[in-house]
Amino acid sequence: MTEEQYITALTNNPHGIRNIPNPTEAMQLTCVGQNGMLLQYIKEPTQKVIETALSQAPRAIQFVENPTEELLKTLVEKDWAVLEYISDPSDTLIQSALAQSGWAIRYIANPSEELQLEAVKANYDALQYINAPSEVVQLQAVQESYLALRYIDEPSVAVLEAAVKQDPQAMRQITTLTKDLALHLFKVSAAIVGYIPNTLGVTVDEIKAIIVDAISGDTVDEDYIRELINNKAIGGRQSKWPIDLLSLIDAYGTKIVKKIAVGEYLKY
């Protein structure tokens, strides 16, 4: 067969390259131009063939012997997932990959805590690719999204506190929720009160006692007070927690709490 005939055949079936001894550069280009991964079947490819293959499939870098740092940098900048096929990547390549996606952490061997933090800041769910993340990393992840709790087997109380502050829906992700824990988390975030399951046996009086402590204490958490006032789960008889919050504020609230309450109610 002539080179032209081979090229015609390879155009229709590029995988045929593996059965051709000593294919010409033109034949090689015909194949890798369609499927860069076919580079694995080409012995001693020219630079042009390598570049064509990588342009079509960056993952073909795994079949390139001794690639230059410049080439690797160009590929990683195009597709962070290429990091998977780079052995012992430089700090520059790692930073480039993480700048695109926190998921790149999965391809970094023994990443430092600093790199782990960078990863979960970019993508909270990168936590799933980190082996035994420290509490610091867990905290950063849940501060980005409470859904990071899905990837933490035994979250500490501090992590749970951070999660409910990020979003009260975090309560739905807590698989070991107890009455005591629910009451503790209510002290941290008033917004979670509507997510406390009835099955825990939390009483109205217990919720009321925590509210009284919050509004009468020497130190006032203004955000907490606003969460209380604007929480639809607390209020009339039809609400989940039929507590007359205004009466409690009037009877036990500090001047600061009463001022906040007036400001919040004037919004409506």
Regions found by a protein language model. Name each.
Residues 1-268:
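Alpha-helical scaffold segments
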